Amino acid sequence: MKLFLFLLLTATSGLAGEWTIPLAGNTYRTAPAPGSGINRAGKLVWSNPEEVHSIYVHLDQAATFDVALRGASPTPVRWKLASANQSFEIEAEGADLKDYPVGKIKVAKAGYLKFDLSGLKKTGANFGEISDLILQSGNDDLKLHFVKSNKGNMFYWGRRGPSVHLGYQVPKRKNIEWAYSEITVPKGEDPIGSYFMANGFGQGYFGFQVKSPTERWVLFSVWSPFKTNNPNAIPEKDRVTTLAKGRDVRAQKFGGEGSGGQSFLKYPWQSGKTYRFLTRVQPNDDDTTVYTSWFGDKEANEWQLIASFRRPRTKVHLTGFHSFLENFSVNFGAEKRLGLYGNQWVCDTDGTWHEITRARFTADATARGGHRLDYAGGSKDGVFFMKNGGFFADRVEFDQWFEKPSNPETKPTIDFKNLPKGEPVSK
């Protein structure tokens, strides 16, 4: 009996860990262009032999794996799976899902591991369907991070990637009326889906986005005090009102992640250039607050009004000054983005400017839950920075403070009285 137990333990010791990685939350089409092949059932289905679908998983140390694919194809197909400088071909046939052994791979270091999946041969309309990548390892200390399930719609949020934030330390016991900041996006760090948010506050946000290969927006939004994701459900008394907007700016209601007033300008902002953002917060005696934002190319020394909104049931000065970086396109969650957030200042109601030199780096539930580990932020070369996506290795822990050196010479010089007032919309 003792010999039997010994042999049993010996035979199973190579299977100390097994992980099932669902493709629905961890896979991107990476060639010939970013996209998705995941169907509504959460399975990868594709027919183009030129496509490559990449699966990502994070390891905390070097490891050796036995690899398998869980899939099905009613007609004979041949798949190719490449990872860690090794490549395998897998023959598959069968209408029901089953596990197809791939082979053994050895990974030399910790970090993100990518598996590139493609189709070599098909006899039907497509290369079948694949639901999971299965990894087995004899290392019982090994930890893997990936999107494990769709709980909380995490297949969607996980494929978007982690969002990161910088919360700025502003002077206490001061009524802050103005917030100023600058963003520079380095060349090549602005994939589709990027939102570089510059001036965030307790009731809204202001920044710029990459909407498509040919379209970019400057976006300024203010939430209604009425909590809903359906803007049509907001009572008249709780609606955000557009007071003015700049030339070519579109103002409308929005929903989905809270609801309220939204304005945007289609503007061809460029990576490698520095842009500046200015937001004014004016509380009124009738328990409303007016939020107004301007945008401009720093080098051109220009300002243009984006919009001015009035928010009901609100009487506050600037609160919660922050910036963030997010990706809003699930098909571009494997692309890295980087923003340099610099020269933050606030101006109080007495007209005194205060420089911001401290910021707290935080992250969303996708990062905090360990679903994605490709996030970073901090201070470097005199500015704050944030980075996410792309499955990079140099992660920075969230919930820590960073400082940048003071530079009083960069204090904004703004003629507040002569800022563009735009086109009145309503009273």
Task: Write out the residue ranges for each language-model feature.
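Sec-dependent N-terminal signal peptides
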Residues: 3-12
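Extracytoplasmic
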Residues: 17-268, 278-283, 287-427
